[in-house]
């Protein structure tokens, strides 16, 4: 290993000069930027470009839903599936009581689902959208308007995510194009309300990268009040802060998260416990469902897997433990984004259900963990296959004797495509952790651009001799070093 040298240049990393796929794709707009091109000085900088691209892709996703918006949500048993434009949003407007001005969590809903089965902040988001929806006209018109209002609010969330991802790695703003141009982002953004929690999570990660540990915790607490998965990031930071000895920063994050979560949840918990707890009881009692590895096993074996809850919880804990062990034994402390991606991916892969919009949880994390277009597009291809597979399978099982759509064997192939491509991207990230010279983010000498207080910090606790190996020579100033390695994938 050659001696480390300091990096003084703050010039943004240009993916077209490092990534063959990005360079080839740039030919559509004039080719890669030249070595001596002048950067900066123009109001349309990388962050604004990324945000505009994300808004444009979101709008394309809305166009893709146009057949459903005009008629397929409201006519026929399978039209919304054969056109692959299904969304929960218009359907839940009526069946969850928003059309009747029922108050989420407080008012009982007629039908099988007695209370809204979403966390509190997501319920508030849904309620605000219902306030902005015109109360006159036919039910079809009101459902269309409710979807449109939600789409506008979710577009704002998408722009926030794009900006936060672009700003998290200071020298790599263009990596956020992985999020903005992701096919699965455009296809799934308006299926459900997941972008709210993702926006809060992305904002939290930006704050952590800037050393704002308590504000990070507040945003993660609010994100957890909108969706459960963001709390996993606290587990990631527990291990990383353990290795780096940054307990004060971790404590501030935990206190901020707990306080924000309680502020968001406590009023509803106290005043409407049964309605508030519905999300948690529903998640616990829910049987295996579409897209999960457990459904694939059940269909192939004929075993209903009544204990899938136990299996899913046990496997998730096992994988999280393995990821924690990886973090404490790796030759170099893993980057925050790498472990965050692995833990959330483990949660998704082990879950009892995989809704197609869950891919949105991973896209920003993937852009930060492994900003390499080839690997990203391989994964996205598997997710697009699953996106089409679930809708065509639902068309098949709802079309009666017509058998219109994808039979169960084809749907199982779609599930396998999702599982295998996600595992592939996880394997590449693990490879980067074990062999840091393959990590494209660290190629310029950076340590952990999203790590905040962890960036450049010395290790104080490790579990392996490889992790105890001293670094060549700590730089006297700055946190970025150059290992002297050539380009690698």
Predicted region positions:
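Multi-pass membrane glycosyltransferase architecture that uses lipid-linked
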Residues: 2-276, 313-489
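Periplasmic/ER-lumenal interhelical loops and adjacent helix-loop junctions
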Residues: 270-314, 324
């Amino acid at each position: 290993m050659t001696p480390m040298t300091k990096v003084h240049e703050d010039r943004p990393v240009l993916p077209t000069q490092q990534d063959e796929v990005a360079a080839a794709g740039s030919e559509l707009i004039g080719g890669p930027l030249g070595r001596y091109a002048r950067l900066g000085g123009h109001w349309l900088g990388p962050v604004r470009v990324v945000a505009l691209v994300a808004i444009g892709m979101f709008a394309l996703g809305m166009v893709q839903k146009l057949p459903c918006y005009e008629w397929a949500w409201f006519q026929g048993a399978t039209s919304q599936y054969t056109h692959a434009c299904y969304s929960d949003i218009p359907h839940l407007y009526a069946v969850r009581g928003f059309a009747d001005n029922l108050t989420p969590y407080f008012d009982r809903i007629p039908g099988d689902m007695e209370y809204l089965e979403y966390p509190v902040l997501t319920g508030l988001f849904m309620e605000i959208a219902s306030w902005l929806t015109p109360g006159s006209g036919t039910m079809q018109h009101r459902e269309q308007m409710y979807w449109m209002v939600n789409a506008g609010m979710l577009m704002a969330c998408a722009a926030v995510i794009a900006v936060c991802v672009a700003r998290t790695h200071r020298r790599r703003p263009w990596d956020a194009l992985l999020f903005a141009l992701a096919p699965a982002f455009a296809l799934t953004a308006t299926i459900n309300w997941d972008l709210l929690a993702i926006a809060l999570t992305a904002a939290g990660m930006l704050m952590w990268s800037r050393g704002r540990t308590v504000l990070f915790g507040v945003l993660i607490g609010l994100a957890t009040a909108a969706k459960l998965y963001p709390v996993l990031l606290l587990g990631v930071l527990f291990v990383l802060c353990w290795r780096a000895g940054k307990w004060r920063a971790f404590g501030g994050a935990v206190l901020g998260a707990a306080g924000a979560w309680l502020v968001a949840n406590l009023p509803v918990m106290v005043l409407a416990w049964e309605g508030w707890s519905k999300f948690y009881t529903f998640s616990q009692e829910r049987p295996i469902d579409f897209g999960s590895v457990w459904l694939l096993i059940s269909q192939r074996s004929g075993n209903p897997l009544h204990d899938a809850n136990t299996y899913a919880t046990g496997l998730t804990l096992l994988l999280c433990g393995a990821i924690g062990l990886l973090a404490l034994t790796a030759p170099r402390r893993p980057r925050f984004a790498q472990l965050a991606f692995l833990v959330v991916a483990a949660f998704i892969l082990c879950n009892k259900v995989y809704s197609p919009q869950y891919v949105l949880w991973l896209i920003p994390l993937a852009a930060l963990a492994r900003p390499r277009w080839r690997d990203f597009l391989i994964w996205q291809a598997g997710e697009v296959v699953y996106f089409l597979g679930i809708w065509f399978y639902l068309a098949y099982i709802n079309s009666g004797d017509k058998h219109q759509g994808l039979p169960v064997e084809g749907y199982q192939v779609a599930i396998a495509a999702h599982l295998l491509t996600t595992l592939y991207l996880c394997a590449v990230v693990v490879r980067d952790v074990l062999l840091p010279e393959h990590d494209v983010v660290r190629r310029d000498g950076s340590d952990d651009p999203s790590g905040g207080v962890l960036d450049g910090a010395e290790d104080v606790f490790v579990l392996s001799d490889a992790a105890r190996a001293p670094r060549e020579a700590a730089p006297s100033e700055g946190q970025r070093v150059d290992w002297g390695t050539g380009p690698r994938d």
